[in-house]
Amino acid sequence: METLDKIKKQISENPILIYMKGSPKLPSCGFSARASEALMHCKVPFGYVDILQHPDIRAELPTYANWPTFPQLWVEGELIGGCDIILEMYQAGELQTLLAEVAAKHA
């Protein structure tokens, strides 16, 4: 399977998905740590892809997403953004609402 097809499949199969460095429990950078922590505080299931374990995805995703950095949060096939946007939405209460609605829809 080509990298672009892998990315599209991951995004379509996971209603809430974060591409990050490391894992939510063992993040490998501060931005990924803060972003995944905000997601975990929302208490909804989400998927993740450790881009350090998938250099092909790490290389291809920024072009596909038109977003140059990681982490990247995808919700129902749409790119939400990176760490700053995730944290801003969390602090405003918007992330919790969005993720709760999506999780309920896909439960």
Swiss-Prot record:
Residues 4-106 form the Glutaredoxin domain. It comes from the Bacteria. [2Fe-2S] cluster binds at C29. It is found in: Cytoplasm. The keyword GTP-binding does not apply. Its main location: cytoplasm. The keyword Iron applies. One of its GO terms (cellular component) is cytoplasm. Glutathione binds at K21, R58, F70, C83, D84. Monothiol glutaredoxin involved in the biogenesis of iron-sulfur clusters. PANTHER family: GLUTAREDOXIN FAMILY MEMBER, MONOTHIOL GLUTAREDOXIN-S14, CHLOROPLASTIC. Homodimer. This is Glutaredoxin 4. It comes from Haemophilus influenzae (strain 86-028NP). The gene is grxD.
